[in-house]
Swiss-Prot record:
The keyword Lipid biosynthesis applies. It comes from the Bacteria. The gene is plsX. Keywords: Cytoplasm, Lipid biosynthesis, Lipid metabolism, Phospholipid biosynthesis, Phospholipid metabolism, Transferase. Pfam families: FA_synthesis. GO terms for cellular component: cytoplasm. Pathway: Lipid metabolism; phospholipid metabolism. This is Phosphate acyltransferase.
Amino acid sequence: MTSLTLALDAMGGDHGPHVTVPAALRALQLHSFLQIILVGDKTEIDVYLRQADPQLLSRIEVIHTDEVVSMSDRPVHALRTRKNSSMRLAIELVRDARASACVSAGNTGALMAMAKVLLKTLPGIDRPALVSCLPAVTQKPVYLLDLGANVSCDSETLFQFAVMGSVLCEAVDKKSRPKVALLNVGVEEIKGNDQVQQAAQLLQHTEQINYTGFIEGDEIYSGNVDVIVCDGFVGNITLKTSEGIAKLLVHQLKRGLTQGLFVRFLAKLIAPRIQAVLSQMNPDHYNGASLLGLRGIVVKSHGNADETAYLQAISLAVTEAQRRLPEMIKDRLESILLDINN
């Protein structure tokens, strides 16, 4: 397979190289075609490379910088002053075609600002969107966007999100004509604000998008649709609420299975099945949010991701790079706009 290079912001997130470097080494073990550029403090990075397999080390490059974007940096401040930061240098590697994708667990606002300025948006895309997947009862992922990059959106922006989400589902899951819905306060056609109503009108007249109508919050995890579109304000609250409920359920399940001798005995008997269920509910299982609509690939990992979760974000970046996701979005949007204009 053709070689593929990823740029990792090794210093981003709560744990920095303690998580990013071991995850990078595991990614290299999984993908023999993969090359990785680690951007960050070389002294800190080298601590985790000392015992690594020499064959893996031959596929790693380290670019040194001791400047880091902190979680408290405002996006504009980071954009103006953190010009030698590990985050910015990693994105620049994508811009300069030295890497096919970038992964960072750093400051989301700063990552979005830098990516938009350095990589630019695709033709026909006004704003990038942050998208990730949620679990569903059908055992297939459901893509939700936007997750907070754009607090308020007009109808045209929501329409663009629907196009990008549909293409992402096709590219990553290889699903033909994924079902797309708008998140709303009701399923009736008269429900919703002006932006959602107008976005629905646009999607209803777009044959290339398999638009199924409105969906309410209680149906998000049903698996009845593949892509759910909303503005970033609603999307971020939905995501954080989902993660909180998942943690609550895991906590309650674990506590319930430790109360009483007979219950503990049964829990041991079905431990593998319990572990499988808990894994499906764990937000880390779905780690990795894509910044869609850019001319390059950028994947955002949770800031508190552990090694396994960060590896998931790397794997997502690999898949998107292999599918050439930005080009797919660009081509599909051009085709849709051509149909609309004709």
